[in-house]
Amino acid sequence: MADTGTPEDILPGRFRDWFSARGWRPRAHQLELTQAALAGDSALLIAPTGGGKTLAGFLASLIELSAAPRSRPALHTLYISPLKALAVDVQRNLMQPAEEIGLDLRIESRTGDTPAAARQRQRKSPPDILLTTPEQLALFIASANAASFFADLRCVIIDEIHAIAPGKRGDLLALGLASLAEWAPDCRFIGLSATVREPGELANWLDLRPGCAAPRTIRAAGGARADLSILVSRERI
């Protein structure tokens, strides 16, 4: 019998309904990355600004968390941003679709501005999704009980990876990723970028675990269509 399914079939019904309610359709690169991530594969997504790459990075995590809610607090997805302001912004933007889809998730950020009380609570009761920076991750990894905190980690998302990987910040983060790979061997690594000069090198930097296939490189066909209008004044300005 011929396969009559569509690429969108990898999305559960309530996810498809969420896209449809907004007059959207998931883009090909979003579905391709979601499929790779659900298979446990690491990947590098190259998509222009407005291409929906941030949502693409999180879709598989949201699907997994919707299908199998955790019986105890445990970190599922770690998002790493070059800027603390971006981490906080993505946290806010991610909470809206999660709530609209009907997911009961804890999505929190951990930056230099996070109060000490919130940091302590996160250690004792990890959120489902944590958004942070390379420096905050390095501090966390160097702390006691870090291995147990990250043991259940399933996904690491590195946003604007082209801005982090080169230089000292990239070296610092690479050490952190090596620790995460050791503590959570089933974890996948997702890199997001709008522009990459050497995608092969960056993909290899993303996941260097021996015996693992090289991360897949996924390229978006194009960004969102611009919605432009011209305002013409009848009077002289």
Q: What is the meaning of each model-derived region?
A:
Residues 48-51, 63-90, 103, 182-186:
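Conserved SF1/SF2 helicase motif Ia
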Residues 113-131:
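Conserved motor-coupling elements within RecA-like helicase/translocase cores
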Residues 86-111, 204-211:
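Conserved helix-turn-beta segment of the N-terminal RecA-like "Helicase ATP-binding" lobe
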Residues 54-55, 75-96, 135-138, 194-200:
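Conserved Walker A/P-loop ATP-binding site and its immediately adjacent core
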Residues 178, 186-237:
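Conserved interdomain linker/interface between the two RecA-like ATPase lobes of SF2 helicase motors
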